[in-house]
């Protein structure tokens, strides 16, 4: 009886096929990584804009300095020396 081979290609040909299959996966990973970075940057910019807008409206008490003082147990008036 002859030998039963599990691989349809010789080992060198199989490696070439594996390499070809990895390239689209690598391209997909690069694309997804870029998208994640873009989303993170957009989120950071939005957060920055919200924080700067809140600082410009002192009457509402939404400034980040006042919130930090409240977290520490001190009012915003107590932070000034």
UniProtKB/Swiss-Prot annotation:
Function as written in the Swiss-Prot or TrEMBL entry: Targets the cAMP-dependent protein kinase (PKA) to the plasma membrane, and permits functional coupling to the L-type calcium channel. The membrane-associated form reduces epithelial sodium channel (ENaC) activity, whereas the free cytoplasmic form may negatively regulate ENaC channel feedback inhibition by intracellular sodium.
Q: Where in the cell is it found?
A: Lateral cell membrane
Per the record, which residues fall in region Required for membrane localization?
2-11
Q: Give the molecular function GO annotations.
A: protein kinase A binding; protein kinase binding
**Record has Lipoprotein as a keyword:** yes
GO:BP terms for this protein?
Answer: cell surface receptor protein serine/threonine kinase signaling pathway; modulation of chemical synaptic transmission; protein localization
Q: Give the coiled coil ranges.
A: none
Q: What is this protein called?
A: A-kinase anchor protein 7 isoform alpha
| Subunit structure and binding partners | Binds cAMP-dependent protein kinase (PKA). Interacts with PRKCA; only the cytoplasmic form is capable of interacting with PRKCA.
- Lipidation positions, renumbered (N-myristoyl glycine): 2
What residues show lipidation of type S-palmitoyl cysteine? Answer: 5-6
Q: Which gene encodes it?
A: Akap7
**Gene Ontology cellular component annotations, sorted alphabetically:** hippocampal mossy fiber to CA3 synapse; lateral plasma membrane; nucleus
| Membrane disposition | Lipid-anchor
> Mind listing the UniProt keywords for this protein, alphabetically?
Cell membrane, Lipoprotein, Membrane, Myristate, Palmitate
């Amino acid at each position: 009886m002859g030998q039963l081979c599990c691989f349809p290609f010789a080992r060198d040909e199989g490696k070439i096929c594996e390499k070809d299959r990895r390239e689209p996966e690598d391209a997909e990973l690069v694309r997804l990584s870029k998208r994640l970075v873009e989303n993170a940057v957009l989120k950071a910019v939005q957060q920055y804009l919200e924080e700067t807008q809140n600082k410009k409206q002192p009457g509402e008490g939404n400034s980040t300095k006042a919130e930090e003082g409240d977290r520490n147990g001190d009012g915003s008036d107590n932070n000034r020396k």
